[in-house]
């Protein structure tokens, strides 16, 4: 499911093993790609840093899959569990969306009114998991890593660079965490005064460092974990736990595997759909 109540456009581009994206020419034509994200939590991805920030190179948000209809038991990730309430919410929403498409103006007005009533009946989106806004989202990370591969390896003529990290486009990451966001990110976060700036030359490596600094477990964040496992067109070169973090703050120096779960890292609040899942314990205990 994409960004609009008409899912026809999205499903036309993502079907039968085909995945198409509409990408800004500037991102492909540039000699060096520079990414300048804020450091925030994210309802669909856990965190939004460099890898998630590449949604910005897209030219039409309705080409981007955000979640898959249903529950994990149905092969979806819209809701965690299949209940009569989630069934009723999904069925009612689908009916209203079709009405909005069939009756422009009237249908759209009805949909807006129904959303207000639905909030009372099914719960506020800032407290109730829906639309893939939880740690079981298995769609958004895939879309984001596709975009990263396109920017790293895509050529203006539609072909790709050799599938070797050494051939990827030069890339610089500067993460603004001076005032970031925690809790219900990305749109309604609480301020996070981490007062840090992270930088590096690989988006997955910098995102891994950001996750550890935030006090989270990389193995529980698919968008970061899977970036280190990407095949075909690699995004990262090594095991994330061996990446060295170098900081002017001595307690933050060391391999990410050793720093994960350290009390020296920040203690931050995840999005409510990720609370109790994403937080790190000491990495050596986690591995054991």
Question: What feature does the model see in each segment?
Answer:
Residues 1-288:
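Extended, low-polarity segments enriched in aliphatic/aromatic residues
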């Amino acid at each position: 499911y994409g960004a609009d109540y008409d899912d026809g456009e999205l499903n036309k581009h993502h079907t039968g093993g085909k995945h198409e994206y509409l990408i800004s020419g500037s991102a492909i034509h540039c000699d060096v790609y520079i990414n300048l994200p804020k450091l925030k939590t994210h309802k669909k991805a856990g965190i939004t840093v460099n890898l998630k920030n590449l949604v910005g190179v897209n030219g039409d948000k309705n080409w981007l899959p955000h979640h898959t209809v249903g529950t994990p038991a149905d092969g979806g990730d819209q809701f965690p569990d299949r209940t009569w309430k989630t069934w009723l919410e999904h069925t009612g929403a689908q009916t209203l969306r079709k009405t909005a498409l069939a009756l422009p103006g009237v249908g759209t007005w009805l949909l807006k009114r129904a959303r207000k009533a639905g909030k009372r009946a099914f719960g506020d989106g800032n407290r109730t998991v829906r639309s893939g806004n939880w740690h079981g989202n298995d769609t958004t990370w895939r879309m984001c890593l596709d975009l990263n591969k396109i920017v790293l390896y895509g050529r203006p003529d539609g072909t790709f660079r050799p599938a070797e990290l050494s051939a990827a486009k030069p890339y610089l990451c500067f993460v603004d965490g001076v005032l970031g966001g925690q809790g219900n990110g990305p749109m309604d976060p609480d301020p996070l005064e981490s007062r840090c700036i992270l930088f590096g030359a690989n988006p997955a490596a910098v995102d891994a460092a950001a996750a550890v600094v935030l006090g989270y477990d990389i193995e529980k964040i698919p968008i970061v974990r899977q970036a280190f496992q990407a095949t075909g067109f690699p995004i990262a070169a090594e095991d994330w736990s061996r990446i060295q973090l170098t900081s002017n703050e001595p307690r933050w120096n060391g391999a990410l595997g050793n720093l994960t779960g350290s009390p020296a890292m920040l203690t931050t609040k995840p999005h409510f759909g990720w609370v109790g899942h994403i937080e790190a314990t000491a990495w050596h205990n986690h591995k054991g």
